[in-house]
UniProtKB/Swiss-Prot annotation:
One of its GO terms (cellular component) is protein-DNA complex. The keyword Transcription applies. InterPro entries: LysR_subst-bd (IPR005119), Tscrpt_reg_HTH_LysR (IPR000847), WH-like_DNA-bd_sf (IPR036388), WH_DNA-bd_sf (IPR036390). This is Hydrogen peroxide-inducible genes activator. SUPFAM superfamilies: Periplasmic binding protein-like II, Winged helix' DNA-binding domain. NCBIfam families: PRK11151.1. It comes from the Bacteria. Pfam families: HTH_1, LysR_substrate.
């Protein structure tokens, strides 16, 4: 038995499909299947039920998967400890980002991070919050940048900046001549939302419910750009995070208005595993991003004033 065998086993448990598990491990399906059989022979127990086309684990298999996850997490800690013996801000770093942050934040921070930490090899991974937290817990990710939610409280959260949301309406909307919109004005309105799984959806829904607004259930978007295009087409209104909003008040048929009483906002944070030996690395990374984004958010706020 070796570490790679445990990685195959955990991948199979996560994907419940031999080909997809093999692809995630960058090996052929016969290789992965053969190693799982060898693992069963070595342990003397059946890990999988082979009476169905589905991947079903036996009770012994499920127990071993959980133990394998624990072992892989400890291996990750050992690698981090070894990494700490060199330069703190050098070597590979796997960073996860949510889709409503990544495309808009990365152009702001990546050039700065390359200049500040030229020896840091950054690998970027985009996924929804629940997927990022699972990958962070398993050790596949070193840290993640996301909007703080209840589920992220199990990790160390380092706040980076607060991101206000703006109301996006089509340019011929009756409110288009306003300078800003009170949240109470949304009472009775129906807003376009992202599909389930996006934390921004839950946050925007919370603000809408507090204001007496509701969701327009005729359509749910897979991305912020789809939401923006639906608004431009006159299909509805929505809340968008300010990093995704252009500097112009009106662009491509969409008018963007600040909201107040209260101002809807979310907190973007860097999160990492408790007890990680690379805590100093993550804190230094967070400090750099926070300092850079504080100036950027101040500029955005001044433009909206």
């Amino acid at each position: 038995m070796n570490i790679r065998d445990l990685e195959y086993l955990v991948a199979l448990a996560e994907h419940r499909h031999f080909r997809r598990a093999a692809d995630s491990c960058h090996v052929s399906q016969p290789t992965l299947s053969g190693q799982i059989r060898k693992l069963e022979d070595e342990l003397g127990v059946m890990l999988l039920e082979r009476t169905s086309r589905k991947v079903l684990f036996t009770q012994a298999g499920l127990l071993l998967v959980e133990q394998a996850r624990t072992v892989l997490r400890e291996v990750k800690v050992l690698k981090e400890m070894a990494s700490q013996q060199g330069e703190a801000m050098s070597g590979p770093l796997h960073i996860g980002l949510i889709p409503t942050v990544g495309p808009y934040l990365l152009p702001q921070i990546i050039p700065m991070l390359h200049r500040a930490f030229p020896k840091l090899e950054m690998y970027l991974h985009e996924a929804q919050t629940h997927q990022l937290l699972a990958q962070l817990d398993s050790g596949k990710l070193d840290c993640a940048i996301l909007a703080m939610v209840k589920e992220s409280e199990a990790f160390i959260e380092v706040p980076l900046f607060d991101e206000p949301m703006k109301l996006a309406i089509y340019q011929d909307h009756p409110w288009a001549n306003r300078e800003r919109v009170a949240m109470s004005d949304l009472s009775g309105e129906k807003l376009l939302m992202l599909e389930d799984g996006h934390c921004l959806r839950d946050q925007a829904m919370g603000f809408c419910f507090q204001a007496g607004a509701d969701e327009d259930t005729h359509f749910r978007a897979t991305s912020l750009e789809t939401l923006r295009n639906m608004v431009a087409a006159g299909s509805g209104i929505t809340l968008l995070p300010s990093l995704a909003v252009p500097q112009e008040r009106i662009r491509d048929g969409v008018c963007y208005l600040p909201c107040y009483k209260p101002e809807p906002k979310r907190t973007i944070a860097l999160v990492y595993r408790p007890g990680s030996p690379l805590r100093g690395r993550y804190e230094q990374l967070a400090d750099s991003v926070r300092e850079h984004m504080q100036l950027h958010m101040e500029k955005l706020s001044a433009q909206s004033a």
